[in-house]
Regions:
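Bacterial N-terminal signal peptides
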Residues: 17-28
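N-terminal start and proteolytic maturation junction detector
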Residues: 6, 25, 213-216
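N-terminal secretory signal peptides that target proteins for export/translocation
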Residues: 1-15
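Scaffold/interface architecture of coatomer-like assemblies
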Residues: 31-597
Length: 597
């Protein structure tokens, strides 16, 4: 589900709340609950492919130093409490090697190479302006600049992204020189999420003022009108005032749920795009998420997505579970950093916040703010543990979190085992890694989702392709290159047919040898103007084939190419080319700027 950010920024604050009540109520339906219940009780329908689960494992001593020399026999992997045989094992000591794109005129590629062997270390940083108060955004940028200027290795592959209400943006690509990143950070300007309105609106929404009278409890009408001290009239006015106040509070809660749904969708979408951008690069990646908190809560035991106020979010669950799938496939460890710094003491159960008349709504607001802070910390910790990272909050020194994220990826173990296919129950599978060594600390992701949406790539086909086409990031699920070919007269007057060729590098994993060498590749290309408007019609083709021996040998040796064309009028365009593997769901994409004379 994708909702335009413009939908939450028009009109007066109170009008916005009231208008979107109806929209929100349409989003929250009983049928969504029914679908979710059916999905929870359904069995997983595995394909014929074996599922290799890769788990990066960080093992340190009490001082935090990496423990070297462990063997495969020293490790035990448990899935839902049952031991699984380790199929692959490797100890990795990574070096800060620059990732470099291969520059060639009129050649656009998503392939990245390193100076030596395949790079197994990337640090990614997301500044979350969508879910972060404006003042805290400035603090986060200053802390990040402090880390980059003092600690960053100039060879360390580092990517910086900004998330705001327009989506995810690339500030610095991980193939670029990290020195450029320091200069670029000075130019990053955060944009806060549409938040609290005027003090009067906040008071109205939280019940700190009487919406039709004074706060003194007197009854008044228009300015200058005397109070009418009749019991019946006072009772009627009080009743209407209470009803109206309830309506306003109800509308505010409904709008807050709607606004939260938008933030959840944008946040999950950003996580998916970042995971896709590094999914084709081997090794563990550290993702530092610097923000004021995720816009959702999760359960520690099931990692299920908790309701957002009155919104059950049932229809968002597939997107949430798919996000986990992509994070795990990309071997991303999440390091959430709460940029709000040290927080003041929060109210507890012993605090008396309910005795003063007229303060009920405000006290509820204080309580909800405090619990949101606790919720932020809990969700950050859950996400960090589930991915093998660490969470940092309630600190005025964020540099530690940035530094630890890089250090954890310097040395680690990569363990692989095959998924337990005898368990066909959908849901969260707990994962535990144990080491037969005393006085060591082991950190690995604590689980993963197994649902039909995660094992059947076709379920997310449409949303995956649509996101890839609009994303500013090149996806690296498969290595590809594209170039512009010749230009001929178009079928429509005033337009030209611009031909292009896309080449997918040889990749044995694209071919299913157990199904008569089955190969499924889908090519799609779209063009937009510099302002983001659609230009012309998308073009593409899907290949679903079982190549004969001669053709198969050529594909294995040289890869496979596709020739397409876009019908465009003269002008400048941003073209996005996407290639999707229909068997695994992997995606490769590349941007190819174009000027048509």
């Amino acid at each position: 589900m994708s909702i335009s950010s413009r939908a939450i920024s028009f009109g007066s604050p109170l009008l916005r709340r009231l208008v979107f009540v109806a929209v929100l109520l349409l989003c929250v339906t009983g049928s969504a609950n029914d679908k979710n219940n059916k999905e929870s009780s359904a069995e997983v329908k595995f394909s014929a492919h074996t599922e290799l689960v890769m788990v990066p494992v960080v093992v340190t001593d009490k001082s935090g130093a990496h423990v070297n020399g462990l063997k495969k026999e020293d490790f035990t992997v448990l899935e839902n409490g049952s031991e699984r045989p380790i199929a692959t094992f490797e100890e990795i000591a990574s070096q800060p090697e620059r990732l470099i794109r291969r520059p060639t005129p009129n050649m656009f590629t998503n392939d990245v190479t390193s100076s030596g062997r395949s790079t197994r270390r990337i640090t990614l940083i997301v500044l979350d302006a969508l879910n972060t108060p404006f003042l805290d955004q400035t603090y986060a940028r200053n802390q990040l600049l402090k880390y980059l200027s003092q600690s960053l290795d100039r060879h360390e592959p580092t990517g910086l992204f900004l998330l705001d209400r327009r989506g995810i943006h690339v500030v610095h690509h991980f193939t670029s020189d990290p020195q450029v990143l320091i200069a670029a950070l000075h130019k990053v300007m955060g944009e806060p999420l549409q938040g609290s309105d005027s003090p009067g609106d906040l008071a109205l929404a939280t019940g700190t003022t009487n919406p039709i009278g004074s706060q003194t409890g007197g009854v008044s009408g228009m300015a200058g009108s005397p109070a009418v001290p009749t019991t019946a009239l006072m009772s009627a006015v009080s009743s209407e005032a209470a009803a109206f106040q309830t309506l306003v509070q109800d509308s505010a809660l409904n709008f807050e749920s709607f606004q939260q749904r938008v933030a959840i969708t944008y946040t999950l979408d950003a996580l998916q795009q970042v995971a896709r951008a590094v999914g084709g690069v081997p090794g563990r990646k550290a993702l530092i998420w610097a923000g004021g908190g995720f816009p959702f809560s999760v359960s520690d035991n099931t990692m299920g997505l908790a309701p957002a106020g009155r919104d059950t979010l049932s229809d968002v669950l597939p997107m949430y579970e798919h996000t986990w799938e992509l994070l795990n496939e990309a071997q991303i460890a999440l390091y959430p950093v709460d940029v709000k710094g040290v927080q003041p003491n929060m109210p507890n159960a012993s605090d008396d916040l309910s005795t003063s008349p007229g303060t009920t709504g405000f006290n509820n607001y204080l309580r909800s703010t405090s619990y949101r802070q606790l919720d932020t910390q809990s969700t950050f910790e859950s996400f960090a543990a589930a991915t093998g990272g660490r969470a940092y909050f309630n600190s005025n020194d964020l540099v530690e979190g940035f530094r630890d994220a890089v250090q954890d990826s310097e040395q680690y173990y990569m363990i692989g085992y095959y998924l337990d296919r005898s368990n066909t129950k959908t849901g969260w599978r707990k994962l535990a890694v144990k080491v037969k060594r005393d006085h060591v600390q082991v950190r690995a992701r604590s689980g993963f989702f197994v649902t039909n949406a995660t094992v059947n790539p076709e379920i997310n086909h449409d949303s995956d392709v649509a996101t890839a086409l609009k994303s500013p990031l090149d996806y690296t699920g498969m290595s590809l290159a594209a170039h512009w070919d010749d230009v001929v007269a178009g079928k429509e007057a005033g337009k030209k047919s611009v031909r292009f060729i896309v080449h997918v590098d040889p990749d044995p994993s694209l071919i299913d040898t157990t199904d008569d060498n089955h190969l499924v590749l889908e090519f799609v290309a779209t063009a937009t103007t510099p302002t983001g408007e659609k230009a012309g019609e998308p073009t593409g083709k899907k290949f679903d084939m079982h190549p004969k021996p001669d053709a198969l040998a050529t594909i294995k040796e040289k890869g496979i190419s596709y020739r397409g064309a876009l019908e465009l009028a003269p002008g400048e365009y941003n073209v996005r080319i996407v290639v999707r593997d229909g068997l695994s769901g992997r995606i490769g994409s590349v941007a190819a700027p174009l000027k048509v004379d």
